[in-house]
């Protein structure tokens, strides 16, 4: 009774407090996986745009006094809840690296962990959940030219990573519930690269140092999307900000790329030559490369009871290097005004400059 009386006498003051809390909460977010490559760039852009940022991850990847870190297991709701309580938006970009080839780990983190994220968001009163998905959820190793979000999920995903990203994306989009003020969206980037990239550039340079970048698969004309990391982050933030204004965006996936498809081998060559390595000069017909990779995969299956081999030359890697796969951003442009912030030329230049420690001496 006393509470009711006090609430009645201070109604204006309490309402004002709620408004202040709502305004401050709207600019407070948590980045799950914020210690990773994409996550760190996301934290930086969010801070620049005036957000208060929490990071949840299995380890603290950097120091920043403006960021509150929460360390824990993504699948443990007790670990996760403190990082999500009191925030309006959650950006979920945590995932094992695609090349890890650990099916159980992918399933646990990408699917089970994401279900835990959804449940915890609801418990904590989070209003928006933006997932980092992947354009590969629709790719099956055959050409995709200017693919839209209407393409069906891959019936035969190219790897365990993609298989679990499909499960993850479906779970997040199905969780969209405007009636309960919980809105979700998925961002599908493709070929993320940029400063501090732990995968594409280091792996490419390592292959070049070992003499494995002398050949290109196919005629070198197949167009592919590579996306600068800052453009990927920009797409996430735009989606979140427009999701609060237009609930009709909820429950949808959006392709986010540089909107400049580039021949696969041209892109790799620009990185290589920018760091003083030779670009591939010789062509292997696509059909021949695929056939050889297929035979190798059969050999690996035959000897697998005796010896475990992880071949790097696989049919799906041949397909990734030799097919067209680029995607339309028209949906993101139309619904939340996405435009790449950084052009491909500038993105490649900045990326090469950031990896000066990998440069080959002339």
From Swiss-Prot:
Membrane topology for this entry?
A: Single-pass membrane protein
Transmembrane region(s): 287-307
MF annotations from Gene Ontology: 3-beta-hydroxysteroid dehydrogenase (NAD+)/C4-decarboxylase activity
- Please name the GO terms of the biological process aspect recorded for this protein, alphabetically: cholesterol biosynthetic process; cholesterol metabolic process; hair follicle development; labyrinthine layer blood vessel development; smoothened signaling pathway
Residues the record marks as active site: 161
- What EC number(s) is this enzyme filed under? 1.1.1.170
Q: Which GO terms describe its cellular component?
A: endoplasmic reticulum; endoplasmic reticulum membrane; lipid droplet
Q: Which PANTHER family match?
A: BIFUNCTIONAL POLYMYXIN RESISTANCE PROTEIN ARNA, SHORT CHAIN DEHYDROGENASE_REDUCTASE FAMILY 42E, MEMBER 2
Protein name per Swiss-Prot or TrEMBL: Sterol-4-alpha-carboxylate 3-dehydrogenase, decarboxylating
Organism equals Mus musculus (Mouse)
């Amino acid at each position: 009774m006393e509470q009711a009386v006090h609430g009645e006498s201070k109604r204006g003051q309490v309402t004002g407090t709620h408004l202040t809390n709502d305004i401050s909460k709207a600019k407070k977010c948590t980045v799950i996986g914020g210690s990773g490559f994409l996550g760190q760039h996301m934290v930086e852009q969010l801070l620049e745009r005036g957000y208060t940022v929490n990071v949840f991850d299995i380890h603290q990847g950097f120091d920043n006094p403006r960021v509150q870190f929460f360390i824990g297991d993504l699948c443990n709701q007790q670990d996760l809840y403190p990082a999500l309580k009191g925030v309006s938006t959650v950006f979920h970009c945590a995932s094992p690296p695609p090349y890890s080839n650990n099916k159980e780990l992918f399933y646990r983190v990408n699917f089970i962990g994401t279900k835990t994220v959804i449940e915890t968001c609801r418990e904590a009163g989070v209003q928006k959940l933006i997932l980092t998905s992947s354009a590969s959820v629709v790719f099956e190793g055959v050409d995709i030219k200017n693919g839209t979000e209407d393409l069906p999920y891959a019936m035969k995903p190219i790897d365990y990573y993609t298989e679990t990203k499909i499960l993850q994306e479906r779970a997040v989009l199905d969780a969209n519930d405007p009636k309960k003020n919980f809105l979700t969206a998925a961002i599908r980037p493709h070929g993320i690269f940029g400063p501090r990239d732990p995968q594409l550039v280091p792996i490419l340079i390592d292959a070049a140092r070992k003499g494995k970048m002398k050949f290109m698969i196919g005629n070198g004309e197949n167009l592919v999307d590579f996306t600068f990391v800052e453009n990927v982050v920009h797409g996430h933030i735009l989606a979140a900000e427009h999701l609060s204004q237009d609930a009709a965006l909820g429950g949808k996936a959006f392709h986010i790329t540089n909107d400049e498809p580039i021949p696969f081998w041209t892109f790799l060559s620009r990185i290589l030559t920018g760091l003083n390595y030779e670009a591939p000069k010789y062509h292997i017909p696509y059909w021949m490369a695929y056939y050889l990779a297929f035979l190798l995969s059969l050999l690996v299956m035959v000897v697998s009871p005796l010896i475990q081999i992880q071949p790097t030359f696989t049919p799906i890697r041949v397909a990734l290097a030799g097919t067209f796969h680029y995607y339309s951003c028209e949906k993101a442009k139309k619904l939340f005004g996405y435009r790449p912030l950084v052009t491909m030329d500038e993105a490649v230049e900045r990326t090469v400059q950031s990896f000066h420690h990998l440069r080959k001496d002339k």
